[in-house]
Amino acid sequence: GPLGGCCGGIKKSAAAGISGINYGIAAGLPGKCGVNIPYKISPSTDCSKVQ
């Protein structure tokens, strides 16, 4: 679904060279923006299971 695609995009962008990405800060961004993402943003997130 769309969330899985978004998740994959986040991980791909991170892997492509956002050096020093702070996943603790990244994980908190959706809440600061008033958006609820039902999965954790981290390198170990399995995007195929995100719905």
Curated annotation (Swiss-Prot):
The keyword Transport is annotated on this UniProt entry: yes
UniProt KW keywords: Lipid transport, Lipid-binding, Pathogenesis-related protein, Plant defense, Transport
Record InterPro entries: Bifun_inhib/LTP/seed_sf, Bifunc_inhib/LTP/seed_store, Plant_nsLTP
GO biological process terms on file: defense response; lipid transport
Gene Ontology molecular function: any one: lipid binding
Superkingdom to which the source organism belongs: Eukaryota
Family as reported in the entry's similarity comment: Belongs to the plant LTP family.
Name of the protein described by the UniProt record: Non-specific lipid-transfer protein
Organism: Lycium barbarum
Organism placement in taxonomy: Eukaryota, Viridiplantae, Streptophyta, Embryophyta, Tracheophyta
